[in-house]
Amino acid sequence: MATSLKNRNFLKLLDYTPAEIQYLIDLAINLKAAKKSGNEKQTLVGKNIALIFEKSSTRTRCAFEVAAFDQGAQVTYIGPSGSQIGHKESMKDTARVLGRMYDGIEYRGYGQNIVEELGEFAGVPVWNGLTNEFHPTQILADLMTMLEHAPGKTLPELSFAYLGDARNNMGNSLMVGAAKMGMDIRLVAPKSFWPDEALVTQCREIASVTGARITLTEDVEEGVYDVDFLYTDVWVSMGEPKEAWAERVSLMAPYQINQQVITATRNPEVKFMHCLPAFHNEHTTVGREIEMAYGLKGLEVTEEVFESAHSIVFDEAENRMHTIKAVMVATLGD
């Protein structure tokens, strides 16, 4: 039976079956091929899409806008300073207003409960562009990228290690994605930065059905041995006070992805992934401040690894657009 996701919200991967997730990845691969060959068919002509960004973004905004334009839709960008959400109007009321004007709504912001409320009351498909807890569109792009760089293999045949802050939205979402798709994931982090135990338990229950393997460890060499992919994210998240940097950098320094970690995988073909932006040199304001304060060349990843043949981060970034397009086409397309 054909998979239909028409009018569905896309709020977190926990809401989707492995078959539905694979369907979205396959659709993204097909849409990417169609765009590259100049044969893309527009299925969102006449659709109006609202993009709500309570947190600013480069990749997510551009990915949604280009994906929408490619498919013939019009977008309205509502930035951090351009809305009354939560100030003069509740999300429940905002959802019901925007749902009368728009055919689909993207939300990037704070608590998962906010996008869940938007999805409950909008009456049109709502897509999670990032919350504090989950980042599902990024995971679709990650899984698609892994498949592209492991030709002939399926997701259950692949393994990856995530190093760093495993309790953030990326650690959470990668664990859910791996559990759903039967993969081998190793979360390599200080124990105080492991995901919430309730989510770990939920993912282990999913893994018992899908065959996924979930490992939590503080040991870098154990965690990265023989993996196909290494993954990390920033150690300091958006909006965190600088006062928190010193302790965070001290705790995370052993989990930096550098040439020693590449070697420890014992896999000369291992690939490096990052959702971006990355602090890999001193060419950003944060990078300069970190180098001056702590003497580090790069934070979560070194320049050497980031710019090496192991790195597939820009393929991964491009695939954000293709997978976001797949979500919109599947849930809203004609």
UniProtKB/Swiss-Prot annotation:
Enzyme class: transferase
SUPFAM superfamilies (alphabetical): Aspartate/ornithine carbamoyltransferase
Top-rank lineage group of the source organism: Bacteria
Record keywords, A-Z: Arginine metabolism, Cytoplasm, Transferase
GO molecular function terms noted in the UniProt entry: amino acid binding; ornithine carbamoyltransferase activity
Family as reported in the entry's similarity comment: Belongs to the aspartate/ornithine carbamoyltransferase superfamily. OTCase family.
The name this protein goes by in its record: Ornithine carbamoyltransferase, catabolic
Organism: Escherichia coli O6:H1 (strain CFT073 / ATCC 700928 / UPEC)
